[in-house]
A protein has these predicted regions:
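Histidine-centered divalent-metal-coordination microenvironment in nucleic-acid enzymes
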Residues: 11, 41-57, 131-137
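Long, repeat-rich segments with strong aromatic
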Residues: 129-134, 138-167
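Aromatic/basic-lined ligand-recognition segments
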Residues: 11, 62-140
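Helical (often loop-to-helix) elements that flank the catalytic cores of nucleotide-handling enzymes
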Residues: 21-32, 55-81, 144-159
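The substrate-binding groove and active-site-proximal loops of carbohydrate-active enzymes
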Residues: 13-22
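Catalytic micro-motifs at enzyme active sites that drive phosphoryl/nucleotidyl and oxygen chemistry
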Residues: 34-41
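Short, small-residue-biased leader/transition segments that mark boundaries at the very start
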Residues: 2-5
Length: 178
């Protein structure tokens, strides 16, 4: 994410080390507090990119994760700013145009990476080759700990769910609460 100092002339990208569990969330909360107390501002081009460990994913988990995110994308878009919705953002492309059958027929991560060849997708599979992570790029830049924590928890639950199943097409937010 690009963030600006209070005079809006000094921009920088903030990259955290690997954060895990409650300890990681506590560290993140402290960083967000420091950024806020320094009057750091986020510009409109910012994105929050979250890498989640994918080292132990099997092909079923990968397929389920992509299908679930794709099927829930329209609902996820509803809690994102307009600049991060649909396929209009160059840096976080939509998954909607990719046929379910192509995702289901992939035999390994390389085939899925071939189907989603750009890293500039809401779900970036290219990160796996280098970092052994799946990168989620849809969220807008923020220094709000609450927003980041909620997004990370949502993604964690989606990954947990993907290890056992996938969401059907046409899912609604109300359905996700059940």
């Amino acid at each position: 994410s690009d963030v600006c100092s209070s005079d809006l002339n000094d921009t920088f990208e903030l990259v955290s080390p690997i954060l895990e569990g409650e300890d990681g969330l506590e560290k993140l909360e402290r960083v967000c507090w420091v950024l806020d107390s320094c009057n750091v501002k986020i510009n409109g081009s910012c994105g929050l990119h979250v890498h989640m460990n994918a080292e132990d994913f099997n092909i079923t988990t990968w397929r389920n994760l992509l299908l679930s995110y794709k099927h829930a994308e329209a609902e996820i878009d509803k809690f994102m700013p307009a600049s991060r919705r649909g396929g209009s953002n160059t840096y976080c492309g939509s998954l909607i145009q990719f046929p379910d059958e192509r995702i289901r027929s992939a035999r390994n991560i390389r085939e899925l990476q071939g189907l989603f060849p750009s890293r500039y997708m809401k779900v970036n599979l290219q990160a796996y080759s280098r970092h052994r992570t799946v990168e989620f790029r849809q969220h807008s830049g923020t220094i709000s700990f609450t927003k980041i924590e909620n997004w990370v928890c949502f993604l964690d639950r989606m990954i947990t769910f993907a290890s056992v199943g996938s969401l059907p097409a046409g899912i609604r937010l109300e359905d996700l609460d059940r």
